Amino acid sequence: IDKLLSGRYRHQTPSFHLVHFSLNKKIVGLGGQFFIIMISMLFVFQLINIVISRVAGPMAVTQYNIAYKYFNVLVMSVNIVFTPFWSAFTDAYVKQEYTWMKNARNKLEIMGLLCIPVAVLMVLLSNFLYTYWIGSEVDIPISLSAALAIFAIAQTFGGIYVTLLNGTGKVRIQMLAYLFSSFVALPAMYVSYYWFGLEGIVLFPSIVCFLQAILGRV
């Protein structure tokens, strides 16, 4: 490689004078915003298990995690579809193909709406599938399954606009939303638990995702 770069392909040898240091601030700034988003998301979602363990006990943590993994199948399936759209939105944004971006967003919204009956069906079949999966040792209330189905739908719609915003590099909105949610998460989850029980703890991250979807849509 050294011989090639010093000989025939010398014009392609990396050089410091080709580096545009003026772009550092923009690149580091965008990367920093993504870092804050990831840390805030990690804090909020891990805090759920801690709060449930503190206020409802270890058994409730088991119930939550089983139901969460069950409905996360829907979220993961949707994310597989969303992933290639990130780079596609970036390419379309650079080329100013706004009509394509709007049409793609509309199709993703339709897919999100189609996920609602799927989530309802998953709730209806949840007790049977839980028993088939883990046996009858852990009883998971249908209300908890319904709460996590709503959470899955909230993540789906939030993911639509996150994909669009990430593709265009406009992540400040979601950074502020997650920062705010990380600051109020603990008291909000405690209050939600005492008002609505275990299902109320899941209510807070669902509201965050729906809020993210609304802000992204606007």
What positions do the PLM features span?
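Membrane-interface helix-loop junctions in multi-pass transport and translocation proteins
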Residues: 1, 169-172, 182-214, 218
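Alpha-helical transmembrane segments of polytopic membrane transporters and translocases
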Residues: 33, 48-49, 62-78, 110
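Residue-level recognition of pore/gate-forming positions within transmembrane alpha-helices
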Residues: 42, 69-72, 119, 152, ...
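Interhelical loop/hinge segments that connect adjacent transmembrane helices in multipass membrane
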Residues: 1-45, 88, 95-99, 218
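Interfacial segments at transmembrane-helix termini and the short loops linking adjacent helices
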Residues: 58, 98-99, 123-153, 199
